[in-house]
Amino acid sequence: MSQYKRTLVTTALPYANGPVHLGHLAGVYLPADIYVRFKRLKGEDVIHIGGSDEHGVPITLTADKEGVSPQVVVDRYHNRNSEAFAKCGISFDHYGRTSSPVHHETAQEFFLDIEKKGIFTKKVEKQFYDEESRHFLSDRYVTGTCPVCGNPDANGDQCEKCGTYLSANELINPKSKLTGKTPILKETLHWYFPLGRFQKKLEDFIEGHAKTWRQNVINYSRTWLRQGLGDRAITRDLPWGVKVPLEGEEAKDKVLYVWFDAVLGYISSTKEWAAKQGQPDLWKTYWQSPETRLIHFIGKDNVVFHALMFPAILMAKNENADAQYVLVDNVPASEFMNFEGKKFSKSRNYAVYLHEFLEKFPADTLRYSLAINYPESRDTDFSWKDFQNRTNGELADTLGNFVKRAVDFTNSKFQGEVPAECTIEDWNALGEGWHGGFKKYEEALENFHIREACFTAMDFARFANRYLTESEPWKVIKTEPEKAAKIMAMALNLCETLATVFAPILPETSAKIFDMLGVSEAAQAKVGENLFEKVKAPQLAKGHKLSGKSEILFRKIEDADIQPELDKIAAMLAALEQKEAEKATENFEPIKPTITFDEFEKIDLRVAKVLECERVPKTDKLLRLKVQLGTETRQVLAGLAKYYTPEALLGKNVVMVANLAPRKMRGMESQGMVLAVEDAAGCLQALSPEGDSIVGKPVK
């Protein structure tokens, strides 16, 4: 028997600096909603908590660009995204926001409690400061000349022209974006969270879940732990955010870093939910009880924050505390969903936004298309043709066709009543092809296998459709009306089972089926009653009255319906290609001076195999590789951390300069150079020979 009496589900807080696109929905919000709806269907105590992440530099930059306050920006996108989620049937119990007073109070209380325990450290560092505006400047608020390509408009974190990642103090002639003045370097003090203090606890925590969590979560976490956890800044010099709740000059104009403040939004949002129930302390039952199971639905880019950093914050809060916060029990992190073979990208305007999609197509068609392509263990793809084919072939021709035929025939031939008793003997005679699906479906959802659950649900629909087609009640009724009545009694009970099984995936469609069957909403959702268990047996008795309603559940999507979307993609791709061509022309580096063949022969290029790979601490650019080079192994540092996870390079054959003089970087020696080329999107791709290249062999 489970140790848990209730489940608390959270979903990553979308950043309130733009609209949610289909990739976000597919990886995080839809699978969480399907899981939560299934738990409710079983009568379990479950709440779904979400909200908007409303602090950080990108929001202030957008506000500055538009000439409005950050609050105007976050209000716009919080409202747009929450409305789109609701329209798509994402059933949050509460959808909060990190700009709310409750959240600010919660985040400040956490900070003060951990500060009083002496866990934080403080460090003085130098940062650019605008004397005219009297503001410290984050990297994105500084512009200047790129030291690599000479672009005079490079940003303090990256040069958009050559793609080089920078820090603001590397820029030549830096200027403040606020005033255009030259900033000075000025000392500033910041608070740091010592993640290393919790290294052993986190190692034990991760290994304790190694058999139950997804491999991508375990691998990402182990990589960070293997590198050794260091101190991480939790404060910034910004005018927008949760104010550091301390008196004195040290804390003046400082806010909590968004990585620390955002995850606490799950707690503050739960507090707001409890207040809505008229029980302000009810949130404690979900956050401070060992009988609560906490689950974080996220994308793979958020693993470290939810598998390591948030647990570390809660561990710090729990030290010497009477009330103990629960730690996460599972982190079902998805891979990415791509769009027509390419990555979704808001910055490059290559995306389908949820609110725009729902203006043209029904929510349930989208929910099905995304759920059955859920990127559980690998990246998947959304395409308009696949969306059309699944809507027409599976939803319309299979599920919709069966339900409408069953309801229409009953209304026409049996006065809209269940015409016979569907006995348990008849029901059991359906065999393993029907009854075996219940266990498969339940186990899939309990273990977050959303695709498998969708396939199983559609198998139920195929079974029912085949049953009606092969039974041919429209023929049987002419000679054996009682047998036809038995067939239709079975078909209508199959309809109710389908309405229940599809309820987590297609909530709007499920409600329509129940309505046609004359099953009231009260009978569909009783607290504490396991409706999923009930529909494993027939529920509609002889004489039960249908509502008399009948409708086409899914309209087929014609080529003409999606052609505008395909045209839009073509325009997007053309614009991207033009932009990339212009960028390539702008960034084309002059050919270097001619060298002789003898000089070229001095360069020793070899095939090397990556044996180990990990991030270099305190930098977001470098990876440390251990490579096999023939009979020897070497350590090589490569600036590929922005483009590859360590796991992605493991076992990969790469091309390296084998006779380059060793060079010290970040206190480590790099014994060679891995070759890479920039692609059209400005991302570095490590050169990797095709075929079965021999490790250690020269490249010719």
Curated annotation (Swiss-Prot):
Cofactor comment: Binds 1 zinc ion per subunit.
From the Swiss-Prot or TrEMBL record, state where the protein is found: Cytoplasm
Any single GO BP term: methionyl-tRNA aminoacylation
Its cofactor is: Zn(2+)
Q: Enumerate the SUPFAM superfamilies for this protein.
A: Anticodon-binding domain of a subclass of class I aminoacyl-tRNA synthetases (SSF47323), Methionyl-tRNA synthetase (MetRS), Zn-domain (SSF57770), Nucleic acid-binding proteins (SSF50249), Nucleotidylyl transferase (SSF52374)
Q: Where is this motif: 'HIGH' region?
A: 14-24
Q: tRNA-binding domain: from which residue to which, for each copy?
A: 599-700
Give the residue interval(s) assigned to the motif 'KMSKS' region: 343-347
Concerning InterPro entries, the annotation shows: aa-tRNA-synth_I_CS, Anticodon_Met, Met-tRNA-synth_bsu_C, Met-tRNA_ligase_1, Met-tRNA_synth, Methionyl/Leucyl_tRNA_Synth, MetRS_core, MetRS_Zn
Q: Which domain of life is it from?
A: Bacteria
**What Pfam families does the record point to?**
Anticodon_3, tRNA-synt_1g, tRNA_bind
Positions binding ATP in this chain are K346
Q: Kindly list the GO molecular function terms attached to this UniProt entry.
A: ATP binding; metal ion binding; methionine-tRNA ligase activity; tRNA binding
Q: Name one GO cellular component term.
A: cytosol
Instruction: List the keywords (alphabetical).
Output: Aminoacyl-tRNA synthetase, ATP-binding, Cytoplasm, Ligase, Metal-binding, Nucleotide-binding, Protein biosynthesis, RNA-binding, tRNA-binding, Zinc
Give the family, as the similarity comment puts it: Belongs to the class-I aminoacyl-tRNA synthetase family. MetG type 1 subfamily.
Which HAMAP family is this protein grouped with?
Answer: Met_tRNA_synth_type1
- Briefly, what is this protein's role? Is required not only for elongation of protein synthesis but also for the initiation of all mRNA translation through initiator tRNA(fMet) aminoacylation.
Entry-linked PANTHER family? METHIONINE--TRNA LIGASE (PTHR45765), METHIONINE--TRNA LIGASE, CYTOPLASMIC (PTHR45765:SF1)
Whom does it interact with, and what assembly results?
Homodimer.
Under what name is this protein listed? Methionine--tRNA ligase
Species of provenance: Chloroherpeton thalassium (strain ATCC 35110 / GB-78)
